[in-house]
Amino acid sequence: MTDYKKPDHWQQKARKEGYPARSVYKLKEIDEKFSLIKPQGKQSNFRALDIGAAPGSWSLYALRKMAGNGFLAAADLSPLSREFDNYDKNRRLFDGCNFFFIQGDITAAPVRETILSKGPYNLIISDVAPSTTGSHMIDSARSLELAETVIEYAQAALAPSGNLVVKIFQGGGTDLLLKRMKTLFKTAKSFKPEACRGESVETYFVGIGFKL
């Protein structure tokens, strides 16, 4: 077994705390640094969108942090993990929070229309990544394409002063993408959480304060 495949501290911690993947701690670090998930009051109108949600760690973190207030929409080609088995699809509730999941291609018109109809959103989070090929050039190009799709969603669905988190594989074109985000948000930064594997080329672009 390679070091990459061996269970590490973050994987073991995720299992213990009921999350399907270690990626939850990346969002936790980002959230703690930028104060992204902060609905107010029992009747909060805070709305969030998780793009590329499966297996569901980021959605679970957001739902727990929202503590029964607000609304979360999530989308992915793959289904969510067994931690969502108790999700009441008729009432659309999860842990007391209004929750909606759509399984499908985020670039498909019907999926896009459904997601946009649930907005506008105060926060969009995305840990979506392409299937890797082993070629850094190809993988980073595909990651860039996905990130651009997420940013297009942000432009269409974010509420004024809304925030965005999107994963990106560092490579050609990523600097230009960050510059683009700086024109769309009051602040846009690159941030690599400690929970990312040391050898990983992934990082996250965080946009704060969407400008219409």
What role is predicted for each listed range?
Residues 104, 118-161, 170-175:
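Mobile active-site "lid"/loop adjacent to the S-adenosyl-L-methionine
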Residues 75-123, 131:
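S-adenosyl-L-methionine
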Residues 65-66, 153-158, 167, 184:
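Conserved helix-to-beta-strand junction in the class I
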Residues 55-68:
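Conserved SAM-binding loop of SAM-dependent methyltransferases across substrates and taxa
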Residues 1-41:
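Class I SAM-dependent methyltransferase Rossmann-like catalytic core
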Residues 42-54:
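Conserved class I S-adenosyl-L-methionine
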Residues 70, 162:
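Glycine-centered, small-residue-biased loops immediately flanking beta-strands
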Residues 170-212:
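Class I S-adenosyl-L-methionine
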